[in-house]
Amino acid sequence: MGSGRGCETTAVPLLMAVAVAGGTAGHLYPGEVCPGMDIRNNLTRLHELENCSVIEGHLQILLMFKTRPEDFRDLSFPKLIMITDYLLLFRVYGLESLKDLFPNLTVIRGSRLFFNYALVIFEMVHLKELGLYNLMNITRGSVRIEKNNELCYLATIDWSRILDYVEDNYIVLNKDDNEECGDVCPGTAKGKTNCPATVINGQFVERCWTHSHCQKVCPTICKSHGCTAEGLCCHKECLGNCSEPDDPTKCVACRNFYLDGQCVETCPPPYYHFQDWRCVNFSFCQDLHYKCRNSRKPGCHQYVIHNNKCIPECPSGYTMNSSNLMCTPCLGPCPKVCQILEGEKTIDSVTSAQELRGCTVINGSLIINIRGGNNLAAELEANLGLIEEISGFLKIRRSYALVSLSFFRKLHLIRGETLEIGNYSFYALDNQNLRQLWDWNKHNLTITQGKLFFHYNPKLCLSEIHKMEEVSGTKGRQERNDIALKTNGDQASCENELLKFSFIRTSFDKILLRWEPYWPPDFRDLLGFMLFYKEAPYQNVTEFDGQDACGSNSWTVVDIDPPQRSNDPKSQTPSHPGWLMRGLKPWTQYAIFVKTLVTFSDERRTYGAKSDIIYVQTDATNPSVPLDPISVSNSSSQIILKWKPPSDPNGNITHYLVYWERQAEDSELFELDYCLKGLKLPSRTWSPPFESDDSQKHNQSEYDDSASECCSCPKTDSQILKELEESSFRKTFEDYLHNVVFVPRKTSSGNGAEDTRPSRKRRSLEEVGNVTATTPTLPDFPNISSTIAPTSHEEHRPFEKVVNKESLVISGLRHFTGYRIELQACNQDSPEERSGVAAYVSARTMPEAKADDIVGPVTHEIFENNVVHLMWQEPKEPNGLIVLYEVSYRRYGDEELHLCVSRKHFALERGCRLRGLSPGNYSVRVRATSLAGNGSWTEPTYFYVTDYLDVPSNIAKIIIGPLIFVFLFSVVIGSIYLFLRKRQPDGPMGPLYASSNPEYLSASDVFPSSVYVPDEWEVPREKITLLRELGQGSFGMVYEGNAKDIIKGEVETRVAVKTVNESASLRERIEFLNEASVMKGFTCHHVVRLLGVVSKGQPTLVVMELMAHGDLKSHLRSLRPDAENNPGRPPPTLQEMIQMTAEIADGMAYLNAKKFVHRDLAARNCMVAHDFTVKIGDFGMTRDIYETDYYRKGGKGLLPVRWMSPESLKDGVFTASSDMWSFGVVLWEITSLAEQPYQGLSNEQVLKFVMDGGYLDPPDNCPERLTDLMRMCWQFNPKMRPTFLEIVNLLKDDLHPSFPEVSFFYSEENKAPESEELEMEFEDMENVPLDRSSHCQREEAGCREGGSSLSIKRTYDEHIPYTHMNGGKKNGRVLTLPRSNPS
């Protein structure tokens, strides 16, 4: 089934200006204009969409019963942008979403509609989401989404942003209707959605297509033109979307017409409008014209040019100029030649007459067969009144409604180039009410060749016929039997012989009849037979039933030619005449009779023959779909199913087949943490009770002993009428759908073509009571054990039952579980069983009252540091599945506290841990929450938490003694170590601690033997609340949390909280706090800020400023257009890159002013705040994530060689100048969106390349200004590189107005240094130690070496070890830095 346009079905190339959603803005790619497609039965033809950008016609994908989800996983057609007619999906199994199939479908124009709809999704049994996240406009028509049992994400779509009018949308009987969908828009699981929200029916709701794709909502002022990713309005000629604002060449689709890569309001010369959406040239239209003229296929039009349009034919009043295909106005009456493709055109209704409206010349023959109609004469004159000439013959046959032929008011010529059998050019037969031909006083008619034929026109006078002979010039051409003298104008007839049927055979839609031959004395008088038949439920039909003077006739009449007969009576072997009746209704009784059609003459009377009326019934066939299936659950193990018989039983319905199969819960429910704030808890409801009176009686009589239910109020007449209209409309749509999509299968030619009709293997009939309840399916979490074994799909086997009535109680089901039920009607219990198309319905059993209760007591285990581990057993067979647990605990005398435990967290710990409990008596209880709601609370469990400092004095003595001895021993060992260290200074081969993410000098080296002392930075523990994990840091887990009163003027602040692992040693805990002490000295807006320390109690916490967008490297990569986690923002502009550069330079200038050298400046170690400010520092998470950015040289420590300067790689020199080299690489990362530097080179090759004087090439399309900055940073001579203050000075004029208010560059702290300090800064920068407490060492080194270049390098190599600001030496590596070659 194609597009229905004949020769228009050839795909033509098209270069469309389309911006690929999620791709590079403004990207142009080639595509094709493809014809409409009907893809059914299998996926073979689906690949024809591979290169289509536009489907000029409709797209139907339907009736695929053997496809599976994996068949669609690798299928994607990203080039498809627009469908000009409609999109229909119907019964495609295995298809779960359209997001991968049509990721860039943006516009459905609706030029031709499917039953008034442009988008139809009907009975898609596995579809879970639409996923058309780039669909922006449905130009004409509405949306119909119906009977999709798994379809969600419908309530989250704002159709008013896609269609102009949503009142005619029909979206019913989907899973979304039952509120069973846990629709989660992107970002909701993290507590903040990224999707726009709009108001529908008074509800302000986020809009999205799937859990990972928001609905794009443009500003209202953009109307339907669409907008860019930044929300800027497209050009007025755009439709749906664009890549750049106000540019007609950057549209995804065009509002009016498309021409040469841009959208235009109208097609300029020499182009013409075509199909209401594109411009074509004359050659294109000419090719269509000649192609169709030569092919003469039905429905193929010979296109012409008119009013700047390439259209199928000229309108009325115009004729085609064959030289240029133009439609030119006629001079006077306009000849409009209408070609009859089949040679003959039968006019049997007003509709068929309208097809000839405006025609003046008929190239072919006309057959008029009108039996009835309203205002028929006026309608025929309006449509046929302009016909002046007929090239063939005119036949008026059995037109009971005609009284005159005057509606042919301009007909003046019948050429007779094609004649009816017997050489007739005018043929009038059996017109019961025809009284007049024309008013011959006013009408002239010429018949060029051929004869006249008049028979069985009882009300047409012979004088009228003879007048026509004279006027038309045919007098003398007729033979004796051409004009019957006794059947024209005379109703008498004689039929006295009985015809008998000799053979009858039936099928479900055909009847084959044969009867005994009949020949009059002169066999030439037999014109043929007339077969009459009609539906007859009862055997009481007479011949004249349903006929009246107005031409109404309830009989269907078929003209049958007489059998062939030889003129030699001796050799005649007459065969039995017969007829095959087609297109009948199955299992229907028909009344049939046959009579002869013979001629009458004035010389003799010929007697005819007629049969008796017989009754024949067609055979049975497959019944239609059972109507109105309703499913309800009356208990936790039963579902009641009711339905109505099919509208077309097509036989005696003997029984019904019912199949049911348990459905697995949505896999997304296992992955989401429903304890997060803002995440909607999924809900499932069982099937509601019946509402109709019949259903209530049905329930009470068979399944419910109580009759105390309240009655519902009777419905009003308007409600009943509305329900009837909706039911009728729904049935009409389904009939239309089935008539369109179910077409006869082509007969197989023996080539073994696969029959893809839905088939079902016979299942063993089992007792319903023996159905085994299976356990719910659990996802495979890594490293998680569970007491509930996962259930595979094989265990959800289907069951079948044969039912002899229109209801069934399905028992033995699992509580609160969804079931998919199929229902088929069957007739004739025979070996070749006939079962019809299945109806589908979904139902869910009621919840079990105690199924969600936790069995057994809640146990506990108390650990040190006042940590209590609570443990309990999962409910063995919950209602659906458990989504979370609620823990309620309280200390005696305090208020009750509640803790939410997610399913995933419970699986990890088989319970949960309560931390930071104060000493005292506690009670705790737990309850589970399933898809059905909350279970019951467990019985309270009691435990006592002691004060870990409250220990007996004798135990204290036992512990304190050894501690004193260990302390004294440590002091002695430490003294020896320091003495040896002073005598053995570290040289170039000395040890250096390097972490996989080194940044700052650690306070552990500043105060190696100190113990942290609480100060004004101390924060009470109760003011810190942990919300969620951010990742693993150097010492332990890093959390996002809330801190109260930690910043002056803010009641509550979102912070990052670093912790120490429980297994950490005392030294590691001290180092952790000492590292926090280092951060206390940083008070720069562009350096991550310390907010407080919690050192009292366990665990130790360090509270830092929260950087909401993570590290700069991840942030830049997320801005790539093809990134899966793209937040919907475009890549940074030049202005934004300059702002980032200045913020990093300002933070580094501050650190240098504090005499700190970074040594690992990279995008991974810069953090991005909520307002996209970039700051120096991280939360200790990049060590595991980016360890591949480091290189272990010579078996020693890890070094970030791709960011290191030549002198650092060669001599181990780390200075402010080497930081400047790294700063240049950071610039390169910003402009390349965090690509890997020196891609294609190994770490060893990078070492050699940089030490030999090489550096990075600027990225493609890099702004020249940033390229110049990079090259300044990559000067081989360190002294030639700029300082960070100079970088800020170069960029200060292009920065945000807020920069002077917050930056170090403009602060009072950045005062000009004294001359001697300035001199030291430039000359002795390499001597700046990593320990800011070692100023005396700096002075001593400067005096000893005299400031020469060689001395500086040698002195630098004597720097002391250092560690990362977020980690101690445990994550460092001791390595020997390489010596420079003596040469």
UniProtKB/Swiss-Prot annotation:
Disulfide bonds join 34-52, 152-181, 185-208, 195-214, 218-227, 222-233, 234-242, 238-251, 254-263, 267-279, 285-310, 292-300, 314-327, 330-334, 338-359, 461-494, 675-900. The chain crosses the membrane at residues 958-978. Residues 997-1000 are annotated as: Important for interaction with IRS1, SHC1 and STAT5B. Coiled coil: none annotated. One of its GO terms (molecular function) is insulin-like growth factor I binding. PROSITE patterns: FN3, PROTEIN_KINASE_ATP, PROTEIN_KINASE_DOM, PROTEIN_KINASE_TYR, RECEPTOR_TYR_KIN_II. It is a single-pass type I membrane protein. The modification Phosphoserine is found at residues 399, 406. The active site is at 1160 (proton donor/acceptor). Residues 687-709, 747-783, 1361-1383 are annotated as: Disordered. After being transported from the endoplasmic reticulum to the Golgi apparatus, the single glycosylated precursor is further glycosylated and then cleaved, followed by its transport to the plasma membrane. Tetramer of 2 alpha and 2 beta chains linked by disulfide bonds. The alpha chains carry the insulin-binding regions, while the beta chains carry the kinase domain. Forms a hybrid receptor with IGF1R, the hybrid is a tetramer consisting of 1 alpha chain and 1 beta chain of INSR and 1 alpha chain and 1 beta chain of IGF1R. Interacts with SORBS1 but dissociates from it following insulin stimulation. Binds SH2B2. Activated form of INSR interacts (via Tyr-1000) with the PTB/PID domains of IRS1 and SHC1. Receptor tyrosine kinase which mediates the pleiotropic actions of insulin. Binding of insulin leads to phosphorylation of several intracellular substrates, including, insulin receptor substrates (IRS1, 2, 3, 4), SHC, GAB1, CBL and other signaling intermediates. Each of these phosphorylated proteins serve as docking proteins for other signaling proteins that contain Src-homology-2 domains (SH2 domain) that specifically recognize different phosphotyrosine residues, including the p85 regulatory subunit of PI3K and SHP2. This is Insulin receptor. It comes from Rattus norvegicus (Rat).
